[in-house]
Amino acid sequence: MQYSSRFLELNIPDSFLNINKIPDATKFITVTYICLTATLFCIRRSLYNKLVLEDPNLDYNLITSPLLQMVPSQIWRYPTSLVLSNFIDTKAWKVVVNLLNLIIGGSFIERNWNSSKEMFKFIIVLGSLTNVLIIMLTLLVSFFSNKVRLDIPLDGNYTILIGFPIIYRQLLPETTIIHLKTPQFLAKNFRFKLLPIFVMFTMTVTQIIWFHHFAQLFSIWVTFFASWSYLRFFQKLAPLNCPSLPTTNSQGGQEILVGDASDTFQLIYFFPDLIKPILRPIFNFIYNVVVVKFKVIKPFHDIDIDIGNTIAESRGAKKIMTVEERRRQLALQVLEERMVNP
């Protein structure tokens, strides 16, 4: 789909908008999301209508259903909320965004992965494990700060809103979404590779300035790092799009690729150049501790990185060059120009 005006150009790949047949996992997750979100709305509205008669000043936002919503103080009585909260939302804007994300983005992702199992794992399993970690962090921080309230529900459904942009960046790295034409000083191509940090920046600023809900801020960033970590190190996919690639793992006689070892999918490249010098030593330290020292995660071999780079380049990602490689390329260009024009 393309749209052009004097102010901007909008370009979305046709494959991204192909929803003629919604894949099985995406269909199941979408239907479950609609049903549970509608159920939660009915439960809260019914409770509110009863309680408001006793207290006319009752705030509707304080009405909760701990069976579905992830309330830290009630989690021991209702552990089902760790899973069910992946399928609910209470804010209208988030319902609309997540439905579009699921129907359009989920269909695109599942077709590219060619695996309903991986879609279920990413949304439900990873989402639930992330919720467990978020609850643990929230309870821990509550011992040191009275600003963290344990009676307010945490949003357990950030995997779609935050995780999907990471996948879009992985599958469509250099594809331009919007090209601003005017004003000239703002003229810029907004590509899918910028979408994750744009979403994270927007949601972080919103929580800090307007909502002041710091437990939700934990949830946002934990979901971001958990989603990236799974895609980077643990996801298992058959290399259907690149059948000629060598693979180093097999499962049930089928060759598989584990994770995304490409240079462009390194965590540091998700962040702006301005803060990379600050973040690089921090990320390197964490990598050395987790991977090199304690071997919690299996490190990538050279062949894994080569395969990852080949797949990333086939998707349109630009090759990451070191300073030495850039200097060598520049020197070759200068030499060629001198040979052509002595």
From Swiss-Prot:
Glycosylation sites: N114
Intervals, Lumenal compartment: 43-121, 181-207
A GO BP entry: retrograde vesicle-mediated transport, Golgi to endoplasmic reticulum
GO CC, alphabetical: COPI-coated vesicle; Golgi apparatus; Golgi membrane
InterPro entries: TMEM115/Pdh1/Rbl19
Transmembrane segments: 22-42, 122-142, 160-180, 208-228
Pfam families linked to this entry: DUF1751 (PF08551)
Source organism, top-level taxon: Eukaryota
Cytoplasmic side: 1-21, 143-159, 229-342
Leader sequence residues: none
Chief place where the protein resides: Golgi
Keyword Transport part of the UniProt annotation: no
Protein function: May play a role in retrograde transport of proteins from the Golgi to the endoplasmic reticulum.
Subunit structure: Homooligomer.
Protein family (similarity comment): Belongs to the TMEM115 family.
Name under which the protein is recorded: Transmembrane protein 115 homolog
Organism this protein belongs to: Saccharomyces cerevisiae (strain ATCC 204508 / S288c) (Baker's yeast)
Lineage: Eukaryota, Fungi, Dikarya, Ascomycota, Saccharomycotina
